[in-house]
Amino acid sequence: MTTVQAGLTYYKQLNEQIRAAQDSEITVENVIGQRYIGCGSTDRKITVHGTAGNGLGQYLNGSTIEVFGNAQEAVGDTMNAGEIVVHGNVGDACGYAMRGGKIYIKGDCGYRVGIHMKAYQQHFPVMVVGG
């Protein structure tokens, strides 16, 4: 398992470190709003501690992302497959245009959640909001 310290790392460098990791299990600690974590990821388990920025898991294609904290806007935008679990709240447009996969939110969501979700052939998107 690889552990990455986010801290004050700029989001582009943080995502390069995540993509470059050889392990399939990655833990990202001290996240303070870095964007696009796990975008387009396939066959990985990414654990996030902190507040994930915009676009968490956009275009996700089979990975699992678990956030111990909150996430900002556009979680799972255009997601194809995989799973996102947020043990907190998320901002606006969660699950926007998702085509498959599952999103579970423990807390509340902002506006326009699940807008343009669509099922196609064997892909059936699922979103559960606990707030």
Question: Language-model segments: what does each one mean?
Answer:
Residues 1-131:
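Long, distal/terminal scaffolding or interaction modules
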